[in-house]
Amino acid sequence: MRDFDFIVSPAKLLTPEIVQMVSSIHEHKGKQELFLEANVDELKTLLEVALVQSTGASNRIEGIFTSDKRLEELVSQKAEPRNRSEQEIAGYREVLSTIHEGYEYINPRPNIILQLHRDLYSYSQGGAGGSYKNSDNVIAETDAEGHQKARFIPVPAFQTDEAMEELCARFLEAWEADRIDKLVLIPMFILDFLCIHPFNDGNGRMSRLLTLLLFYKAGYIVGKYVSMEMLIEKTKETYYEALQASSTGWHEGENSYEPFVKYYLGIMLKAYNEFESRVEHLKHRSLSKPDRIKAVIDNKVGKITKKEIMELCPDISKITVERTLTNLVKSGYIAKVGAGPSTGYVRV
């Protein structure tokens, strides 16, 4: 079994590009406290929206779907799950809420990770959660002709317990020593977790929950207000490319963590930029809702979609956004471009 190194390997990752990304995130974190203190009411809205978006996106990445209406009902606990997909969505909501409410007291130890996995499947039948895989698994990919091939072979089932113990022990040693920036350590831990692939099912969703937990513990709580899972969903191909690049040679200890670390730092930067933008838009609540939508369009260079407007104005209903866009097109203030999912709007 390979060694888990969180001392020497991270030091090799401190390239000028990664150092610049880390420094930028530190700056955003400094401003984060000011936003949190000054915008309490606005943040409540962002929190509620992000909870729904995170739950939906993380499950969709794994092919678990329900309607938008059912998703909102499940996340707000106004409905009971009706099928397997909804059971898994409800379980994700439970674990995400646990992390949001008590991340300071949750440490990434094997027994805790097993408990979180148990809760992930708390609505599911058959006792799928709370124990490591009982058979070897393979991460496969399907080519253009529909043929499957092994992309990565994780740690065998009989070594999983030992691998998780060692991973968590070495990671927590480095975390507590505090010699390496936690922004670099966290993606390394997540990559190792995914290469172990400790569970029969739920590894991808657990990896994203653990990512949020660790970023929160390190003081980067932007994921509460902007869905990092949705940002990952939007860049899913890049995510899998980075994962594949960083997992090559992992068993031999010859892999490079750099692609995966850079990917996650990029997601964090994007999340902070969106957070600051959304808080700024929410400050305009004294304006009417149509005027706020108009202000969003005015501040956008190039095309903007209905979905982007709704993400920036999470407290404005879809009907109001659609009605306002229709009126602005009729008045000649904006023009509609494209068709179908790519439909957007530009200033005239």
Question: What name fits each language-model region?
Answer:
Residues 1-348:
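FIC/Doc superfamily catalytic core
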